[in-house]
Amino acid sequence: MSEGISLSAEFIDRVKASVKPHWGKLGWVTYKRTYARWLPEKGRSENWDETVKRVVEGNINLDPRLQDSPSLELKQSLTEEAERLYKLIYGLGATPSGRNLWISGTDYQRRTGDSLNNCWFVAIRPQKYGDSKIVPSYLGKQEKAVSMPFSFLFDELMKGGGVGFSVARSNISQIPRVDFAIDLQVVVDESSESYDASVKVGAVGKNEVVQDADSIYYRLPDTREGWVLANALLIDLHFAQTNPDRKQKLILDLSDIRPYGAEIHGFGGTASGPMPLISMLLDINEVLNNKAGGRLTSVDAADICNLIGKAVVAGNVRRSAELALGSNDDQDFISMKQDQEKLMHHRWASNNSVAVDSAFSGYQPIAAGIRENGEPGIVNLDLSKNYGRIVDGYQAGIDGDVEGTNPCGEISLANGEPCNLFEVFPLIAEEQGWDLQEVFALAARYAKRVTFSPYDWEISREIIQKNRRIGISMSGIQDWLLTRLGNRVVTGFKDDFDPETHEAIKVPVYDKRAIKMVDQLYKAVVKADQDYSKTLGCNESIKHTTVKPSGTVAKLAGASEGMHFHYGAYLIQRIRFQNSDPLLPALKACGYRTEADIYTENTTCVEFPVKAVGADNPNFASAGTVSIAEQFATQAFLQTYWSDNAVSCTITFQDSEGDQVESLLRQYRFIIKSTSLLPYFGGSLQQAPKEPIDKETYEKRSQEITGNVEEVFSQLNSDVKDLELVDQTDCEGGACPIK
């Protein structure tokens, strides 16, 4: 393999001298605590210029033409492209996904082929492991096993991804009868540092257990793969097809699992110890044993996935993100979170949605659930399979392998397929002098290269090679349209009738300038993909564009999140920090208000006054003032003219608008591919992440801030390695992984 593409120090110095990053009010702080990796040789975490260099070099070197003796002309061309990308990302006119900001260009990326993708989807049905990095020793590669989709989910969650999974009736019906109840004993050596804590959650001392001819013993290696294989073995022993010897006793030895607080060298952070795994294994075994002689239900399968997600949360740089997709007439699935005990124990681990098609009409109970607790969400698989952008019309089977979606709902996915995201802030890019068509072309090429990663799972490799799906998103959409047009995209509504139900409806009227703007950019993305695909000799991407929810990444640039309206014209935004976080002294020195977090010990809540882009515009609207009808209409606009994948949106509604949910879901059934809704809470919760304030309060609080956090932090020189990242819900639905 040839020497890779690298960016020179001279070039980076020129960019730093000429380009100012468009940090939002929380931008640099959010970057430093979330995406700046530790540099052991320098005894500090990365600076922004170093992060962008790592990220861009990690991506540009995925171009497959670099594998074999590339010409000087090719290397020069790719170096120039890397320089354009560097300048774009450094200025925050666009960014790759948060996953890429954290992982791209690291040894972990080079070792772990799946590491650059945010989220995945898997169907919960027996599947073959195939030629994957993880294959249980007792299985042939082509042998179907009940454990496989659970192993896939567990593995991808531990790599930091989110996973959508389908427990629709068509999948669950393929799972055979549970043949055996398994006597599971989890053991830990009495000399282990984790012994006492492990016994408290159900393990026993190793010397207390006697192996016999009827038992299977497995000592887990201290690896991610070891955790996955232990769970796979446990699941598969319950089924005669994968337990031909009819063994009914399993001893899992967790003595080698590193203790709580030990360093995780690959993904980063510190270990949780074996305790969450012990609890997970015992709980999953109970779910399966309870169905011995019978069949698993969609709720059982979702419980297993949720228990896995609960265990994975126990790391300091991950939040387990799951979306459970069930059948729309499966009342047990729809109501599964009403069991408060199980909700508190593990069912919180997924957002739940139901699959519908455009002929579906049973929205009344769904709307009732949404008004009560914001669930279920809606995923229209019929639209996803047969439409790109809605304006381009019906295209039978254009995405025919689609079975579900990622946890945030912006990408329709086939079994084993991942999201592959890049985000453009069009207003910021334009202000920095960029031609938006070039920006979106660079974005498409960046995402295309990610599809050439060496994926760990066979199902993923095969579908990625076929689809080469990319998801080029725009964020700060409300900022851009309001600034460029002087008004919001929905200019009004006109009276009409539903063509099938003949119900009276209000049809949105869109600003035609906005239609032209997004249509031109969509075509620029498609053209860039066509050209690059031809150059690389690979399939064109099956779909290209999306709108992602963009919580953390939008904070970097200070933009509105995806298509969402700002939560308020003026806000107090709160971020929680571990008390030992070196950013805290700098924030206090600069005048930011801080107080002890009332929800979590050893945590400090810091308040940031924020003014939304366009707050003074008379046509500005916030999530607290914009109507539910306009939010639906805005999502429909983007699904019609911009996104050929889907549009992630959490529509917020006031109590007085709850009775509109059912009719609006029905009205947009031919347009919107996925959506979720939540009641608007304003700032009513104590220490709420976002609290709307008035202009006077904003100006008063802003005057209290007297310093630049980045400069003060540098002067204090107090960086710390492996800090715990305190969890916060950055996207409305809480579905996104932190990174």
Curated annotation (Swiss-Prot):
Positions of the catalytic residues: 408, 410
Region annotation Adenosylcobalamin-binding-2: where it falls in the sequence: 685-724
Domain of life the protein comes from: Bacteria
Classification via SUPFAM superfamilies: PFL-like glycyl radical enzymes (SSF51998)
Tagged with keyword Cell membrane: no
EC number(s) on file: 1.17.4.2
Disulfide bonds: 119-419
One BP term from GO: DNA replication
InterPro entries: RdRp_reductase_class-2 (IPR050862), RNR-II_ins_dom (IPR054158), RNR_alpha_hel (IPR040763), RTP_Rdtase_AdoCbl-dep (IPR013345)
Ranges for region Effector region-2: 168-313
Record-stated family: Belongs to the class II ribonucleoside-triphosphate reductase family.
Protein name: Adenosylcobalamin-dependent ribonucleoside-triphosphate reductase
